[in-house]
A protein has these predicted regions:
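An anion-binding loop in the catalytic cleft
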Residues: 2-26, 51, 184, 197-224
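Short, surface-exposed acidic-centric catalytic microdomains
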Residues: 52-96
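Conserved acidic residues
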Residues: 57, 107, 128
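N-terminal glycine-rich "phosphate-gripper" loop used for MgATP/nucleotide binding
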Residues: 61-62, 85-86, 90-91, 104-120
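Donor/substrate-binding cores of folate-linked one-carbon enzymes
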Residues: 46, 112-221
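N-terminal Rossmann-like dinucleotide-binding module
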Residues: 2-67
Length: 224
């Protein structure tokens, strides 16, 4: 049995920390990304370092220029382009994604910078088995410009959140969070870079902890 990484980041959900043991068999992950793929890299590195007992079976990306595909190739992970522009609606798009994930026998779906809204087609295929990471302390600052929203609001602390996916954008039970201070001279770029450092820490930790079904149940039950 493999222990999860040390839980040293502030504001980590106690319901997750109490169940921080990984399973006896490697978890089969399917990762979805739209851009740079730095969170994909963090997960792959955590697996290599023995911090996460899992296997990345496939990367699905929707943007032909996504650097995440290059990262997947570097790690020897199959990557499949599913361009949303090729589908008449979101349901058809999600059907193709579900087919790929099922073909690879995926147990958990990790949205690591996935920039598309999902439909019940995907959610129903993997109920309570999809997690997302977002660059704010949800429920504050939802959407694609969370970092800019935090700066505009003048908050002194922001951060990142790992949560179970739901149909509503950037909602669903919160699993793990990490706080990041907002500095007086921060720009969207500098703040986002510091948030990503914490994303790269807590996403592998959350994946590892979620191997406990009790942790999932606790997170769902305690959600307002």
């Amino acid at each position: 049995m493999t222990l999860c990484p040390d839980s040293t980041v502030s504001l980590i959900s106690p319901s997750i920390v109490n169940h921080a043991f990984c399973s006896d068999a490697p978890l089969k992950l399917g990762i979805m990304a739209s851009g740079n793929g730095s969170n994909f890299e963090a997960i792959a590195q955590a697996i290599k370092d023995g911090q996460l007992f899992a296997e990345i079976q496939v990367l699905i990306y929707n943007n032909p220029d996504a650097y995440a595909a290059v990262r997947a190739n570097n790690w020897g992970v199959p990557s499949i382009l599913v361009n949303h522009r090729d589908y008449k609606n979101r349901e058809e798009f999600d059907k193709q994604i579900v087919q790929i994930l099922q073909q690879h026998n995926i147990e958990w779906v990790i949205m690591a910078g996935w920039m598309r809204l999902v439909t019940p087609v995907l959610l129903d295929a993997f109920p309570n088995k999809i997690i997302n990471i977002h660059p704010s302390l949800l429920p504050s600052f939802k959407g694609t410009h969370a970092v800019e929203q935090a700066l505009s609001a003048g908050v002194k602390i922001t951060g990142c959140t790992v949560h179970l996916l739901s149909l509503e954008m950037d909602s669903g039970p919160i699993l793990m969070q990490a706080a990041v201070p907002v500095l007086p001279d921060d720009t969207p770029e500098t703040l986002h870079a510091r948030i990503q450092i914490q994303e790269h820490r807590i996403l592998p930790m959350a994946i590892c902890a979620l191997l406990s079904s009790e942790a999932i149940a606790l997170a769902v039950q305690t959600q307002p």
